[in-house]
């Protein structure tokens, strides 16, 4: 989860988020090199008295500043497209969970189980126990097995919402009348927090998401107790 004064991303907990962090570092390096080059050229222009007022044509320079940006864009686009295809790929999910957004709470349905569904509301600040997080705790957590591919089907009952878990690299819009899907795989157990990431009304800030990733055996025990 995020901490006060945090400068970087949250710790990656899924293969997709690991790829996104690598892509961020790759792109940031390219941006840093371009910015350094531009600042260097500007500093030279400000400190030298030499000018080329008689230059009418420079084919070599025009060729360089046409080809070089094209190469840079390709270096950014190729890894980006690779990650996009990885995020859309869903191979034989072990579990499917249907998520519906409401004003202002989430409801979940485990489609592989009969009558396993519940609503998830934010716990008011006045009801929090010591150590619990303000505006992030819910009365019913989404319990999922770790290290298994899980498909999330996401939609909305009323207005636009967005289901987002930053540490898993997930953000999928919940659109009325449309069923979007995303896949997640957690590499380690724990609690993972998210929030609605689409302004949806006066209580938009009060729609937290809490995933509890546990070993498969613990998940089976939990699902049996819920039925």
Curated annotation (Swiss-Prot):
Q: Which residues lie on this side of the membrane: Mitochondrial matrix?
A: 46-59
| Any one Gene Ontology molecular-function term assigned to this protein's record | copper ion binding
| Location in or out of the cell | Mitochondrion inner membrane
The entry's Mg(2+)-binding residues are 198
What's a single GO CC term here? mitochondrial inner membrane
Per its database record, what is this protein's job? Answer: Component of the cytochrome c oxidase, the last enzyme in the mitochondrial electron transport chain which drives oxidative phosphorylation. The respiratory chain contains 3 multisubunit complexes succinate dehydrogenase (complex II, CII), ubiquinol-cytochrome c oxidoreductase (cytochrome b-c1 complex, complex III, CIII) and cytochrome c oxidase (complex IV, CIV), that cooperate to transfer electrons derived from NADH and succinate to molecular oxygen, creating an electrochemical gradient over the inner membrane that drives transmembrane transport and the ATP synthase.
Q: How does this chain assemble?
A: Component of the cytochrome c oxidase (complex IV, CIV), a multisubunit enzyme composed of 14 subunits. The complex is composed of a catalytic core of 3 subunits MT-CO1, MT-CO2 and MT-CO3, encoded in the mitochondrial DNA, and 11 supernumerary subunits COX4I, COX5A, COX5B, COX6A, COX6B, COX6C, COX7A, COX7B, COX7C, COX8 and NDUFA4, which are encoded in the nuclear genome.
The name under which this protein is listed is Cytochrome c oxidase subunit 2
User: Which source organism?
Assistant: Neotamias bulleri (Buller's chipmunk)
């Amino acid at each position: 989860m995020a901490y006060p004064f945090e400068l970087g991303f949250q710790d990656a907990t899924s293969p997709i988020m690991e790829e996104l962090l690598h892509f961020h570092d790759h792109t940031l390096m390219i941006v840093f090199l371009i910015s350094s080059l531009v600042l260097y050229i500007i500093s030279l222009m400000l400190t030298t008295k030499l000018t080329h007022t008689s230059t009418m044509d420079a084919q070599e320079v025009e060729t360089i500043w046409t080809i070089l940006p094209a190469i840079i864009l390709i270096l950014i686009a190729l890894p980006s497209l690779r990650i996009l295809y990885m995020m859309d790929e869903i191979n034989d999910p072990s579990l499917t969970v249907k998520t519906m957004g409401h004003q202002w709470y989430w409801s979940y349905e485990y489609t592989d189980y009969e009558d396993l569904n519940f609503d998830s509301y934010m716990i008011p600040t006045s009801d929090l126990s010591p150590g619990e997080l303000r505006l992030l705790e819910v009365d019913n957590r989404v319990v999922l097995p770790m290290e298994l591919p899980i498909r999330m089907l996401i939609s909305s009952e009323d207005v636009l919402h967005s289901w987002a878990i930053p540490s898993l690299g997930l953000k999928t819009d919940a659109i009325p009348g449309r069923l979007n899907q995303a896949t997640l795989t957690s590499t380690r157990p724990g609690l993972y927090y998210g929030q609605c990431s689409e302004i949806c009304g006066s209580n938009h800030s009060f729609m937290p998401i809490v995933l509890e990733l546990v070993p498969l055996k613990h998940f089976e025990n939990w699902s049996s107790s819920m039925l």
